[in-house]
Amino acid sequence: MPTIQLKAMTRELCHELYKHWTNDASIYMDMHLFQPYVYDEAAVNRYFDRKGQDASRRLFAIMLGDKVIGELQLKQIDHDKKECSLSIHMQNDAVKGRGYGTQAERLAVKTAFDELGMAAVNADTIRKNTRSQHVLEKVGFRFAGEDETFQYYRIER
């Protein structure tokens, strides 16, 4: 299997990611909110500026060779509690179900523990997103609870 790398997201990589983006209906609990994605250069710039200026967040491009295939964030980084949350989104169906997300999540957990000094990483998925739940469990996250919309997971050092 080809090797995945996490690279600090740049504005250029962010545009490359979203030029080929497809919204995934499986991550929408309320289908009234689902709309096909249409690339908008100004919107991507605003997104990158907003996320990139957040000191409690690390934004990564998921790289397959020199091609960006997804985005991963370590967010809500709390150095006092030594916890953060993981968020991942793959670009489109062509890169899903191939183990790339699993590799990326493993790298992110290693980064959180080894580089950021975190003791725990949290994650959540909407209840119907069984694919994401399976990947989290495969990486070592444990089910921590649920509510009407989300299932919550946690991995500790």
What is each residue range found by the language model?
Residues 50-56:
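Short loop/turn motifs at secondary-structure junctions and domain boundaries
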Residues 40-45, 51, 71, 135, ...:
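Short amphipathic alpha-helical patches
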Residues 26-47:
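Conserved GNAT-fold acetyl-CoA-binding loop/helix
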Residues 25, 35-36, 52, 144:
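Residue-level detector of secondary-structure transition/capping positions
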Residues 38-40, 55, 155:
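A short hydrophobic/aromatic micro-motif that marks alpha-helical segments and, especially, helix-coil
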Residues 49-50, 111:
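Short, flexible, glycine/charge-rich loop motifs used to bind or transfer phosphoryl groups or to couple energy/partner
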Residues 1-16, 20-26, 59-157:
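Acyl-donor (CoA/ACP) binding surface of acyl/acetyltransferases
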